[in-house]
Amino acid sequence: MNLQNNKGKFNKEQFCQLEDEQVIEKVHVGDSDALDYLITKYRNFVRAKARSYFLIGADREDIVQEGMIGLYKSIRDFKEDKLTSFKAFAELCITRQIITAIKTATRQKHIPLNSYASLDKPIFDEESDRTLLDVISGAKTLNPEEMIINQEEFDDIEMKMGELLSDLERKVLVLYLDGRSYQEISDELNRHVKSIDNALQRVKRKLEKYLEIREISL
């Protein structure tokens, strides 16, 4: 796609009067201002989509940037003959780019080793073959390429967890799901590493029992 500037470009106010599809036509003939307009217009939309996903150990801005790449691709690839609006097409491309990037990162083992090992550890140590990731995601099986936790799914049980977990357990869980290592959590909460591990084990047991009571299929 040619992104060089053309003479006679519209200003922002004029772009606002056009449909997105019309602005894209200008992008496709080299109007970089039109491209900037669409990127700016959809930036918050990308951030909203990025908030739905997070990867253990990843910086949220990394996911936002992947979403922006997906947005650019949607602008580049959108065709007038598509049987959908640009916004719907953009949402598809943004989501696909984010998920692909997360899967690629896990395949390349970009997540911290300690986070991966801990998340993959059975909830009741050797007494159970279900992991914390299995419980939170509601997945029957979960391989490293699928270590994507949907924030919306976690929010559904967050309120109940607030009732079941102690203050320490809640803090440990939040930091753990944010990708912190045991040592980092220990330093931040000024607790021994063993105390952090014990708290997380209690969280796992409470979480599993709660979901079983609710008869959620894992």
UniProtKB/Swiss-Prot annotation:
InterPro entries, alphabetized: RNA_pol_sigma-70_dom, RNA_pol_sigma-H, RNA_pol_sigma-H_factor, RNA_pol_sigma70, RNA_pol_sigma70_r2, RNA_pol_sigma70_r4_t2, RNA_pol_sigma_r2, RNA_pol_sigma_r3/r4-like
Keyword annotations: DNA-binding, Sigma factor, Sporulation, Transcription, Transcription regulation
Domain of life of the organism encoding this protein: Bacteria
Cross-referenced Gene3D superfamilies: 1.20.120.1810, Winged helix-like DNA-binding domain superfamily/Winged helix DNA-binding domain (1.10.10.10)
Residue span of motif Polymerase core binding: 62-75
GO molecular function, one term: DNA binding
GO aspect biological process, one term: regulation of DNA-templated transcription
Residues that span the membrane, as ranges: none
Tagged with keyword DNA-binding: yes
Pfam families found in the cross-reference section: Sigma70_r2 (PF04542), Sigma70_r4_2 (PF08281)
Induction of expression: Association with RNAP core increases during sporulation but not tested stresses (at protein level).
Family that this chain belongs to: Belongs to the sigma-70 factor family.
Function noted in UniProt: Sigma factors are initiation factors that promote the attachment of RNA polymerase (RNAP) to specific initiation sites and are then released. This sigma factor is involved in the transition to post-exponential phase in the beginning of sporulation. It is also required for transcription of several stationary phase genes. Association with the RNAP core increases rapidly in early exponential phase, and reamins constant expression level after.
Annotated protein name in UniProt: RNA polymerase sigma-H factor
Organism: Bacillus subtilis (strain 168)
